[in-house]
Every structure is written in structure tokens, then in C-alpha cells.
Amino acid sequence: LLKKVEQIFVEYIQSDDTSALEQKSLDIFWPVLEESALKAIPYRPTLDERPYESWSRDYHEDVVNIHINNVYKPDSPLSEKRPQFAAALIRLLEDTQELTPEVTKVACGSWLNSVPTFLEIFPDVWKASGQRSKNVRYTLGHWGQFMDRRGDFHARNGSRFREMGDFPYPSLHCTDSLEAVLCHLREKFPEPIVKRLQTKLRRIPLES
């Protein structure tokens, strides 16, 4: 497939209009993409599989790195599921404190750190610490912005990407102390609400 696309690229390399290049390349890839899409089975994890729902984590020295993948589709973790999204993060950070007390910092590299409704979850220090990633990797941290809440292609962001020649939402690496992030979350999401959600989430599979 790549050889065929390479031949098309060479054919149109001098052309200012990329329409033919794009269409002919898509014609090559489309049968493979369509077959894969038709076979795809929606991922519906349970709490046993993803105990922190849309959040996951890994560790490096005294830092817990947090990662995001929307398991609430077609709902959004930043609107309909916002309290549940925050409650799961609180639980992740509380468990981190209990299980790995040597970990004192939280970090995340994601395009979501360029989205105001996501940044509201975190303290001002987190927002101010943002550093743009130097390397573009094949991860949701960069490319997740081209997927909408249903898991389909985000056409508006795709169009902006073409117009700008850059990511609409740059992937930023942000960090703050674990305790500061927890304090901010508890203040923004009152404890009674969070406690009810945490109790409920420990029992109910995500697809329920």
C-alpha cells in the first residue's frame, strides 16, 4: 500500500493542488480502513478492567503520570460525566498516596491541557507549568483531538488542522504536587457528591 501511495506522491509532488493526491491515496487505503472499521467492536470495559474509568497511570521516580481515554462514549468526561470523571481521578490519586507514599507529584502530557474545561479540574500551578511537547508521537496525547466523543473523526478539528498547519490544541506537559491537585479537586467537587460517586463506581460496571 505504501509503495502505491509513494508513487502517487511522486506523481503530484510539484502540484499546488493536493486534491487528486488525497483522493487517489484514500482510494488505496479505504478498502482496508472500511474492513477494519466494520469489524471493530466497541470497547466497554468494566471497573475491574479500568478501576479509574477514563484515567490510568504509571510511575517514574516520585511522579505519577496520568493518562486519559474516554470510556463514557458517547458522553463526554468534560460535560455529562464531569463529576464522575473527577471522582475517579480523586480515587486514583488517593490510592496512589496510600500505596506509593514516595510519589509526591502528578504529571500529564496531553492536548487536553490546552482545553479550558479540562484545565478547570486542576490548580493554577498546573496550568502555568504547561510545556509544549517537542516530539509528536502516535498517541492519544497528540492525536486524540481528532476523535469526537463518539469515537468518530472530529471533522472540525481536522479542518482546523489543515488550515493552521498545526495542532488546534497543542499537547502540553503539565505538573503539580499530588497534594495540591487533590486539595483543588476536593474543593471543586464537594465531598458528599464525590463520596456517593466513589461508592457507586466501586460496584457498577461502566456499561451499566
Language-model-detected regions and their locations in the chain:
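Non-catalytic substrate-recognition and accessory regions of acyl/acetyltransferase enzymes
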Residues: 1-77, 95-105, 116-208
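Well-ordered, non-membrane alpha-helical segments in soluble/globular domains
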Residues: 78-95
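Charged, low-complexity surface patches
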Residues: 85, 107-108
